[in-house]
Structures are given as C-alpha cells and as structure tokens.
C-alpha cells in the first residue's frame, strides 16, 4: 500500500492582494509551495507527489519550484479546474495508472507549509484502516449559527473541529466520491464532505494550530513568525 501526496496549488489568491499567486510568494527565500513540498519530499513513507496548478503556470511550477529545488518525488504537474474540487478531481484522474486502488492519497493544500511529518504519518495510518482521515483542531472560540443577522443557535463547542489538511483516503474511496459529486454537480467545501455524503466514516486526526493556510497578508506575518520560532 503506497502513499502519494496530491497538492492543490491552483488558487488565485485574490485575498492576498499580490501580483503573483499565493503559492509562489516568497517566504524565507523560497516559494510557499516549495516549503510545503519539502515536507512530503522528506517523508520517507511518501512514494510520490502530484502537484495541481493553473494550466498556464505548469512550466513556471516545473522550472522554478520542482526542478529548482530538486523535488524528485514529483510524478506529475496537473492543470487545475474552475474550483478546488474540480482541480482535485483532475489530479485524481491524472493519478490513474500510477496508483493502486488501496494506495493512500494525502490531499494537502499547497499553501499549508507547516504541516509536520508526524501529522502526515498519523493521517496515513488512519486512512489505511478507516474510510478516511481528516486532520483538524478543536475550535477555541464559541461558534454561532446565524440567519439574517439573528443568532439561531450555539452548537456545543466540544463538538466543533476546524478542518485542515491533509485529508487522507484510499484512492478508490476518494476517486469514487469525487466522480459521484461531479456527476451530480455537487460542490462541497472539502474532500471529506464528499466521502461523508456517501455514508462513509471519516475519522479525526488531531492536528496543529500552526498548520495554517496562508491566504492573507496577516497569514504571511504569522508564517514568518513561525519560521523564526522553528529556527530558534
């Protein structure tokens, strides 16, 4: 049972307000995407990586990230779609012929560079035994449900978790979930949701609050602080 990473990096990053897409912004001398790929490259149990990027950025990703930083595990760079879900489906289809049905696929945002090898390993172990694994952290704040500006409920905080990535599944499970969602024109907010709607069980893997998704200038400030902390 091999392990492959599928790394969506096709976002446009409008909230960042930068002239280039967020995955290529420089963090401590390297693109954010390069930091993320380094974690998978260095994980001995990860056998290969597929990166998803906008079609017109494939040469840039290949030349300035994959080849420049020597990511030898990258098996393919795949063109993204209109939405993240479409991009992931493109990636899963591109994996056909390379991965087996029971291989574990770690789907991880290209702009989450602080994921740890330990988290990857624990998510992989769960995905081998269950229908899927979702890395998440407990909610710290009280969450309200609201309609038309009026609070309609307060879910018990102990039941609320903030979803992160990676989200890990066996290839046959996640491929089927995405194909069915695509055929039914259902658009979910994450990969686990597509598996859940088929009646399958996705287990929580406790993550790390530092595993942030870098989408705003404020996130870049946090990321730089995390790097300084790690270097200390």
From Swiss-Prot:
EC number(s) from the headed UniProt entry: 2.7.7.60
Domain of life: Bacteria
UniProt xrefs under SUPFAM superfamilies: Nucleotide-diphospho-sugar transferases (SSF53448)
Catalytic activity: 2-C-methyl-D-erythritol 4-phosphate + CTP + H(+) = 4-CDP-2-C-methyl-D-erythritol + diphosphate
Any single GO BP term: isopentenyl diphosphate biosynthetic process, methylerythritol 4-phosphate pathway
Pfam families: IspD
Spans traversing the lipid bilayer: none
PROSITE patterns (alphabetical): ISPD
Pathway assignment: Isoprenoid biosynthesis; isopentenyl diphosphate biosynthesis via DXP pathway; isopentenyl diphosphate from 1-deoxy-D-xylulose 5-phosphate: step 2/6
Site (Positions MEP for the nucleophilic attack) location in chain: 157, 213
Record keywords, A-Z: Isoprene biosynthesis, Nucleotidyltransferase, Transferase
An MF annotation (GO) of this entry: 2-C-methyl-D-erythritol 4-phosphate cytidylyltransferase activity
InterPro entries in the cross-refs: IspD, IspD/TarI, IspD/TarI_cytidylyltransf_bact, ISPD_synthase_CS, Nucleotide-diphossugar_trans
Record site: Transition state stabilizer: 15, 22
Signal peptide span: none
Family the entry assigns: Belongs to the IspD/TarI cytidylyltransferase family. IspD subfamily.
HAMAP family, alphabetized: IspD
Function as written in the Swiss-Prot or TrEMBL entry: Catalyzes the formation of 4-diphosphocytidyl-2-C-methyl-D-erythritol from CTP and 2-C-methyl-D-erythritol 4-phosphate (MEP).
Record protein name field: 2-C-methyl-D-erythritol 4-phosphate cytidylyltransferase
Gene that this sequence comes from: ispD
